């Protein structure tokens, strides 16, 4: 799916994607497609369609037009929980990092899409 943002959980020495000692733990698109990592991580991704889902063609068309979305991220020790829902597609993932890496980063990017007006909120 083009025009679809995705999230990357990674580590690197300088905190940059592709930086020195870059290691990728998860690459997850907002449509639920994901790539397996060769790193020491276990990724569980659950995709569900809610009553708001009206088909992939409609989903793609609305994404191309632009949508607002929220991503919730929570970390508990070596586990990272991510959850998002948009246009009836619910994506939940749990990544368990098993190599002892403490400093992890999340990048938001996309293929043939524009990402703007990004805001970060901390919930307690």
Residue ranges and their predicted role:
Residues 65-81, 85:
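Localized edge beta-strand/strand-to-loop motifs within extracellular or lumenal beta-rich domains
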Residues 1-47:
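Secretory/extracellular carbohydrate-interaction modules
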